């Protein structure tokens, strides 16, 4: 059984919704399991409530918290993060910055790594967030997998949609009111399945 972790940070639920779709894609591939994990929050409960994020986060409060030690158990890790000024969220960066010991031991070398993201706007940094994230995965010796154009939904032109060859993305809107579209969720499911198929071959 190939073990695939989906490690994410979500403030308002957009990335959590995408993570569930990615997990569905993983589980559609025989011999592969999906485990959802969320990185620790850095923002106080008081501030989360002020920003209106506390209620949104309650919907996925049951998902276990990721630990650095747990990452080594996976055959592949698919990371999900919102964009913060063209980069990953601080919560994800903080978590990854604690993986020095794992890097030293080569614990992630040869494992598959993949990334999905969300932005507020159509050109809000979805691609730079993913490609800059790849630097960390390469330092860990991971094998990066994206979303090839065999996923025809990447070519959709009749609606505004996230998604790129670097990974699935969703557009949240400036006020966060837009939820992931079916096209975006389908690309996320494809990414999960694509990673699972490659991981299954590597671990056979």
Swiss-Prot record:
Q: Which residues bind FMN?
A: 10-15, 83-85, 118-124, 139
Annotated Flavodoxin-like domain residues: 4-195
Annotated positions binding substrate? 103
Q: How is the cofactor bound?
A: Binds 1 FMN per monomer.
Alphabetically ordered keywords of this record: Flavoprotein, FMN, NAD, NADP, Nucleotide-binding, Oxidoreductase
Q: What is its EC number?
A: 1.6.5.2
Pull one GO CC term from this UniProt entry: membrane
GO molecular function list:
flavin adenine dinucleotide binding; FMN binding; NAD binding; NADH:ubiquinone reductase (non-electrogenic) activity; NADP binding; NADPH dehydrogenase (quinone) activity
Chain residues that bind NAD(+): 12
Q: Which cofactor does it need?
A: FMN
InterPro entries from the UniProt entry: Flavodoxin/NO_synth, Flavoprotein-like_sf, Flavoprotein_WrbA-like, FMN_Rdtase-like_dom, NQO
Question: What does the record give as the reaction this protein catalyses?
Answer: a quinone + NADH + H(+) = a quinol + NAD(+); a quinone + NADPH + H(+) = a quinol + NADP(+)
| Residue stretches spanning the membrane | none
Q: Which family does it belong to?
A: Belongs to the WrbA family.
NCBIfam families membership: flav_wrbA, PRK03767.1
Name the UniProt record assigns to this protein: NAD(P)H dehydrogenase (quinone)
- Organism encoding this protein: Trichlorobacter lovleyi (strain ATCC BAA-1151 / DSM 17278 / SZ)
Question: Lineage of the source organism?
Answer: Bacteria, Pseudomonadati, Thermodesulfobacteriota, Desulfuromonadia, Geobacterales
């Amino acid at each position: 059984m190939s073990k695939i972790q989906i490690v994410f940070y979500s403030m308002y639920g957009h990335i959590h919704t995408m993570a569930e779709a990615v997990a569905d894609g993983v589980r559609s591939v025989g011999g592969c399991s999906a485990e959802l994990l969320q990185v620790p929050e850095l923002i106080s409960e008081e501030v989360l409530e002020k920003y209106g994020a506390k209620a949104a986060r309650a919907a996925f409060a049951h998902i276990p918290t990721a630990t650095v030690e747990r990452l080594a158990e996976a055959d592949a890790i698919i990371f999900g993060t919102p964009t913060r000024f063209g980069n990953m969220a601080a919560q994800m960066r903080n978590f990854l910055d604690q993986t020095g010991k794992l890097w030293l031991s080569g614990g992630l070398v040869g494992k598959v790594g993949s990334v999905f993201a969300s932005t507020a706007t159509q050109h809000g940094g979805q691609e730079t967030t993913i490609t800059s994230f790849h630097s960390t995965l390469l330092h860990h010796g991971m094998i990066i997998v994206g979303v090839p154009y065999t996923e025809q939904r990447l070519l959709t032109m009749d609606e505004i949609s996230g998604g790129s060859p670097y990974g699935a993305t969703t557009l949240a809107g400036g006020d966060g009111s837009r939820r992931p579209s079916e096209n975006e969720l389908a690309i996320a499911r494809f990414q999960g399945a694509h990673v699972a198929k490659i991981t299954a071959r590597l671990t056979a």
